[in-house]
């Protein structure tokens, strides 16, 4: 139904991946350090947020900036790098970025002078008409941030931002996105200032995965680089994955680099890569090309980086004809660069892999991307365990196959149920979070005789226990063997056909048994 709060008389329609600018965004302003210089190169220390200004806003302190939208420090608010602007956790921000003026839109999440006392984690921004998230100075730290199909930069940094960030994920919009990151050091009248009051942006970024709009995209006149450096930007980017951008890996403006460093990053496909010279993915002044942290003067990777064009090994990755990503499992395969190449120490959370994802897909369960079916669950271990053959024995007392004893099924293996298994009294079957179990059935060629059917199932008898305690991010999955075959693209011997899959759909049932738990409480 139509609601009275919008300006039309139409119910909906529901926004899509292409739809942005339908409302504003979320803006948080604090009193931590920002770098905004005057014409003499001295840091002013505060600024007014871009986006919109209410007509009734008042400048009480006479600094030319209306007070309600100021951020940073001044005579009213002392500098507080531990500023606490609140908590934003498990929040999805969708279809915002209202255009308040020609070329002036609102970011999905804007953080102006926000300090380390603020919690920003597990946040998603989808299809925003401007940047996904922008840091204007401040010291705030973030983790588990996802940007999907935003129409400008995914991660924008400016004005002396110095936070520490881990587990950033970006998928660019193929028709209007700019860079994965637009990263600036300082703003104001004298960006080259050497005044001691000016500290340029120098964040620490670990475990990012940036996916571009695809190398053949033609619908946008914007940058389509993994990231752009400007205004003396300094940072340290480590243990990250950058892939499938139409232009350069790094674009650097003439005054862009201000102490930038990087190590142990996987460099994927880029439109500018000529197939032979790693330096072709750098769109930068000669000074940066000569001393860049990625490749030597002869183009050899240094500081643990890969060659350009390295496959990041995503477990699933498909696009439609318009360039939109339609399916991704960003967890890398076990033999891929993000899994096997070295990582740098020092990240806030230990992660023995490059990029934003290891075994756990933290997008599942709470994001728009998952709800829309864009997040595939295609990473499966290589080791298969035939439970009937290896973990059960015939029990003469019960006349069935029971577990040989209490056991734990671990997430680094696949468990195959070719028939019923029983957990009898005093036995405990423990299943780790993230474990996948696949069942089969075999009617032995006698469709009308059910007595000889073999049906994968788990039956917990009285006195036995099943401890299957999954998590939001690592659920335990029981499924049909056809799903495993579809993911691997090969037929397995445990079912009765010679076909790989096909993957079951919402209409498909009856492919295995189920889960049965029997207790000894009162029944009537």
Which residue ranges define each predicted feature?
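Glycine-rich N-terminal segment of FAD-binding domains in flavoprotein oxidoreductases
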Residues: 435
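Extracellular beta-rich repeat passengers
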Residues: 1-151, 156-432, 440-465, 469-524
